[in-house]
Regions:
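Receiver (REC) domain switch/active-site residues of two-component response regulators
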Residues: 141
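Residues at the C-termini of beta-strands that transition into short coil/loop
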Residues: 25, 119, 147, 171
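P-loop/Walker A phosphate-binding loop and immediately adjacent motor/lid segment at beta-alpha junctions
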Residues: 95-110, 153-198
């Protein structure tokens, strides 16, 4: 079990992010609840052993995030059957320069859509992080937190790869000042397809 662990505020999006993404996948069913559009950003410093997507570690990988792509994301998200947007990577919270404007726009123009994000940070670490990360967190509905730990791998977990990771209701957690687990947690009853990406 190895990974990198930052000191609070050590990793700064404005210093690391190159404004790039690995992929954008519209209309999928595996990255959260319902039909979702998933944005995979480039760059991650955690480097979890057994990571399913090592290709996302480099901040220079992939393609530039563009205004044209953002318009496509918004158009896809506007479809009535799409429940929301999912932010993955790479590490979304090290790409706040891209994601904060996008998420703010979604909140303004498509406020009925939900936003999920995965992160290598734990909730407790996030509470000690930089203002940009905390602002992005405040705009998200559901957070899957924590590093992937291959010694705790479990394919029966819903939307997670290892049992140390949690599915957190962000708004309830922020309001209550402590972690509140997503009330639709359904471990062991989801298909392999929903967890295989971990």
């Amino acid at each position: 079990m190895t990974w990198n662990t930052p000191k609070p505020g050590e990793w700064k999006s404005e210093e690391l992010s190159q404004g790039r993404i690995i992929d954008y996948k519209a209309f999928n069913f595996v990255d959260g609840e319902g039909v979702r559009n998933s944005l995979y950003v480039s760059g991650c410093m955690f480097h979890c052993e057994g990571c399913y997507n090592v290709a996302t570690w480099s901040f220079n990988a992939g393609i530039p995030y563009t205004a044209e792509l953002e318009e496509q994301i918004m158009a896809d998200l506007a479809q009535p059957y799409v429940q929301g947007l999912t932010l993955l990577g790479g590490e979304p919270f090290l790409n706040t320069g891209i994601l904060l404007p996008l998420v703010k726009r979604i909140r303004k123009e498509l406020s009925d859509k939900d936003i999920w994000s995965w992160t290598g940070y734990t909730w407790e670490e996030m509470m000690l992080e930089t203002p940009d990360k905390l602002e992005l967190l405040s705009l998200i509905d559901i957070l899957v937190d924590g590093r992937y730990d291959r010694t705790k791998r479990n394919l029966m977990l819903q939307f997670r790869g290892s049992s140390n990771q949690r599915i957190i209701d962000v708004q309830k957690s922020l309001k209550g000042g402590q972690v509140v687990i997503w009330d639709k947690l359904n471990d062991g009853k989801e298909s392999y397809e929903q967890v295989k990406r971990e």
